[in-house]
């Protein structure tokens, strides 16, 4: 009878996944600091990236070094933001946000993923119109819905969405109101479990069978690329077993 993966094997896989996540967060911190300065109190994007790092148990020293490299206090690599759009099998729209120090490498990697999984890359704007850019502050079950809703609306949020299946709550904002709402809720003692600005599809597309398998394969392959920060799609996640 065969044996499952060893404890050491599982640990190595976990360490690799954690290392990849740290790399992505450090790149986001670097770009945010270079664009808006190294003071998170005056740079909402940097603060969001730092919060993400701290939530992932990244040390403050690692975060500080990333900031200093970006602001010129330490030598570091300069990354640029690039975005690619395309279609997965079944007409599923996909947006891929990247931070890279080599555009040629990145576009080749992204194009390879689309091609290998039966999709195709599109031109700029080819699918972005199917999505809205918005801030999402996510709260776990257990928080008082009325208190959160009142505070969020007063702070300038656009909507509050409650998920009855698990009791989680999302506070939705316009991108330019994201930092204001987050700070107001924090001041009221309401700290989200997760907060970021994302693309959210206007409508989801259902897929099944082999198409669902290929879509999942493409999304996983894109997310696993070192230069890719975020992958958004309009696939119905339930169809992928998510």
Curated annotation (Swiss-Prot):
The keyword Cell division does not apply. Belongs to the TACO1 family. It is found in: Cytoplasm. InterPro entries: Integrase-like_N, TACO1_YebC-like_2nd/3rd_dom, TACO1_YebC_N, Transcrip_reg_TACO1-like, Transcrip_reg_TACO1-like_dom3, YebC-like. One of its GO terms (biological process) is regulation of DNA-templated transcription. It holds the Pfam family TACO1_YebC_N. This is Probable transcriptional regulatory protein XOO1659. Keywords: Cytoplasm, DNA-binding, Transcription, Transcription regulation. GO terms for cellular component: cytosol. It comes from Xanthomonas oryzae pv. oryzae (strain KACC10331 / KXO85). One of its GO terms (molecular function) is DNA binding.
């Amino acid at each position: 009878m065969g044996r499952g993966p060893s404890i050491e094997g599982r640990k190595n896989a976990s360490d690799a996944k954690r290392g990849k996540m740290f790399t992505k967060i450090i790149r986001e911190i670097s770009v945010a600091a270079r664009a808006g300065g190294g003071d998170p109190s005056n740079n909402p994007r940097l603060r969001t990236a730092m919060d993400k790092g701290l939530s992932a148990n990244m040390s403050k020293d690692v975060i500080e070094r990333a900031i200093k490299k970006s602001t010129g206090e330490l030598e570091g690599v300069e990354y640029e933001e690039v975005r690619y759009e395309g279609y997965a099998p079944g007409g599923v729209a996909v947006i891929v946000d990247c931070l890279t120090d080599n555009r040629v490498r990145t576009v080749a990697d992204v194009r390879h993923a689309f091609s290998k999984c039966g999709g195709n890359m599109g031109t700029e704007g080819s699918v972005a119109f199917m999505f809205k850019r918005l801030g999402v502050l996510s709260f776990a079950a257990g928080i008082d819905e009325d208190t959160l809703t009142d505070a969020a609306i007063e702070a300038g949020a656009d909507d509050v969405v409650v998920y009855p299946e698990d009791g989680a709550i999302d506070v939705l904002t316009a991108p330019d109101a994201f930092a204001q709402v987050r700070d107001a809720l924090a001041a009221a003692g309401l700290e989200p479990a997760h907060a970021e600005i994302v693309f959210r599809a206007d409508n989801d597309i259902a897929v099944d069978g082999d198409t669902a398998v290929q879509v999942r394969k493409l999304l996983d392959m894109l997310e696993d690329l070192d230069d890719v920060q975020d992958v958004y799609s309009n696939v119905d996640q339930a169809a992928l077993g998510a």
